[in-house]
């Protein structure tokens, strides 16, 4: 091989190979520091597109889970209020039974207490709210529980007042009960109201069960999508460490060889002395 001063082809070749190895080492370090196999579109354009689509789906599903949890909180708020109304109706029924026993009572005291309890039912109906929404408004509250616009669950409640107690099929009006003169009739009305409240609670319980099963299914779906996204985007650390070590050795070797190649012109100078 001839010795030349103007063109050091060995140094040029060594520099080119060193640049390649250094670039590979930099990419390997980037992957290891980020934990991702794909950090930009150039790494894997198709893989990045799939990964981003899966990420969007995962975020949507996770939000749907939060929506369903809000639905459960709404149902529990309504259930808690109905539980209190049920207890009040049980007390009014006791008062009606007591007032119906004319041998020991004229019903005045029982009637006074019953009317105060009915006011409390009205208060519960108007004051029970969830996130600013009146819970008992005879309107459906819709919860988005999936990525599709059709993935919704509607929770329906009814107006709740002593004058209009309904489960959607039957109704009861307790506003006119009078335990001084109509205790027996009041007993029937109150029992009808208790049945209505029980039906409402059963309907809410069914809605809560559906929401809970929906959350379970969404969580499973989210886990599966996360696993798929991880397989596409995440880095195999062990495999990458092997590549990193190889590229690191190549950079060290390339640096040494470039230094050796740069010494060749010096050898030519020695011949000229």
Regions found by a protein language model. Give the residues of each.
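Primary detection of the long, small/polar-rich alpha-helical "axial" segments characteristic
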Residues: 1-273
């Amino acid at each position: 091989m001839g010795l030349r001063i103007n063109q050091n082809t060995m140094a040029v070749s060594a520099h080119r190979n060193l640049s390649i190895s250094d670039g590979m080492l930099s990419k390997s370090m980037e992957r290891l520091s980020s934990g991702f196999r794909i950090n930009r579109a150039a790494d894997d354009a198709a893989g990045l597109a799939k990964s981003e689509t899966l990420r969007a789906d995962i975020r949507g599903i996770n939000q749907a889970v939060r929506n369903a949890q809000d639905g459960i909180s709404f149902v529990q708020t309504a259930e808690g209020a109905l539980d209190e109304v049920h207890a009040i109706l049980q007390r009014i029924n006791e008062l009606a039974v007591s007032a119906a026993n004319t041998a020991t009572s004229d019903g005045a005291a029982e009637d006074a207490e019953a009317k105060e309890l009915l006011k409390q039912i009205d208060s519960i109906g108007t004051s029970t709210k969830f996130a600013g929404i009146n819970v008992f408004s005879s309107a459906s509250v819709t919860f988005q529980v999936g990525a599709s616009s059709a993935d919704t669950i509607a929770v329906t409640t009814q107006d709740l007042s002593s004058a209009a107690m309904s489960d959607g099929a039957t109704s009861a009006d307790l506003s006119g009960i009078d335990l001084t003169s109509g205790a027996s009739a009041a007993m029937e009305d109150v029992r009808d109201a208790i049945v209505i409240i029980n039906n409402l609670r059963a309907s809410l319980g069914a809605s809560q069960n559906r929401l809970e099963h929906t959350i379970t299914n969404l969580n499973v779906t989210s886990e599966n999508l996360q696993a798929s996204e991880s397989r596409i985007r995440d880095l195999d650390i062990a495999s990458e460490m092997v590549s990193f070590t190889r590229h690191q050795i190549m950079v060290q070797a390339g640096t040494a060889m470039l230094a050796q190649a740069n010494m060749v012109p010096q050898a030519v100078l020695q011949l000229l002395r």
